[in-house]
Amino acid sequence: MKKLSILAVLAASPAMAATGPFLSLSNTNFIVTLAFLLFMGILLYAKVPGRILGMLDKRSVQIRTELEEARALREEARTILASYDRKQKEVQEQAARIVASARDEAQAAAEQAKADLRASIARRLAAAEDQIASAEAGAVRAIREQAVSVAVAAAADLLSRQMTPAAASASIDESIKEVEARFH
């Protein structure tokens, strides 16, 4: 600070170029120089430059601390951003896996439904064929029974027309003998 004061005094040397005696109180340049030197002396006596330097040092330390905090916050923000990006990628991958799994399950369910439908159709078709076969067998049986009934009725009618009482009596006796022979 002393060097600064000396430099300020030397910088006032252009005031020496004024006309008239320099050390006169009527010379304004001399008065201004005296006031400046007195002001500088008061500042030095009150240790203002040291205080200013102390405040500037404190401010520089505070700025340095804030810069370090800002760097730490920036690094923390980068770390959080990287973590967020990783988590977002993981969530996207998990969502893709869930969609693929759901798609596979839906396809499997569709295939199972198709297989179940085919099996149901096959069962119904088999049941219908069984019903048709049963109906055919019933119809054939009914036709045979009807044919047997018609044949028996026709044979009975034919026999009753052709049979005489003596032939009927002989036929009955012969049938009785045949039954006795079979049972004994």
From Swiss-Prot:
Does this entry carry the keyword Cell membrane?
yes
Tell me if Transmembrane is a UniProt keyword of this record.
yes
**Which GO terms fall under molecular function for this chain's record?**
proton-transporting ATP synthase activity, rotational mechanism; proton-transporting ATPase activity, rotational mechanism
Q: Membrane topology per the record?
A: Single-pass membrane protein
Q: Which Pfam families does UniProt cross-reference here?
A: ATP-synt_B
Identify the main location: membrane
| CDD domains xrefs | ATP-synt_Fo_b (cd06503)
GO CC annotation: what is one?
Answer: proton-transporting ATP synthase complex
Q: Where in the cell is it found?
A: Cell inner membrane
Q: Which UniProt keywords apply?
A: ATP synthesis, Cell inner membrane, Cell membrane, CF(0), Hydrogen ion transport, Ion transport, Membrane, Transmembrane, Transmembrane helix, Transport
InterPro entries given in the database record: ATP_synth_b/b'su_bac/chlpt, ATP_synthase_B_chain
TM annotation in the entry:
4-24
Assembly and interactions? F-type ATPases have 2 components, F(1) - the catalytic core - and F(0) - the membrane proton channel. F(1) has five subunits: alpha(3), beta(3), gamma(1), delta(1), epsilon(1). F(0) has three main subunits: a(1), b(2) and c(10-14). The alpha and beta chains form an alternating ring which encloses part of the gamma chain. F(1) is attached to F(0) by a central stalk formed by the gamma and epsilon chains, while a peripheral stalk is formed by the delta and b chains.
Q: What does this protein do?
A: F(1)F(0) ATP synthase produces ATP from ADP in the presence of a proton or sodium gradient. F-type ATPases consist of two structural domains, F(1) containing the extramembraneous catalytic core and F(0) containing the membrane proton channel, linked together by a central stalk and a peripheral stalk. During catalysis, ATP synthesis in the catalytic domain of F(1) is coupled via a rotary mechanism of the central stalk subunits to proton translocation. Component of the F(0) channel, it forms part of the peripheral stalk, linking F(1) to F(0).
Similarity field: Belongs to the ATPase B chain family.
Please give the PANTHER family that the UniProt record associates with this protein: ATP SYNTHASE SUBUNIT B, ATP SYNTHASE SUBUNIT B', CHLOROPLASTIC
Identify this protein by name. ATP synthase subunit b 1
Q: Which organism is it from?
A: Cereibacter sphaeroides (strain ATCC 17023 / DSM 158 / JCM 6121 / CCUG 31486 / LMG 2827 / NBRC 12203 / NCIMB 8253 / ATH 2.4.1.) (Rhodobacter sphaeroides)
Q: What is the lineage of its organism?
A: Bacteria, Pseudomonadati, Pseudomonadota, Alphaproteobacteria, Rhodobacterales
As recorded in Swiss-Prot or TrEMBL, the protein's gene is named atpF1
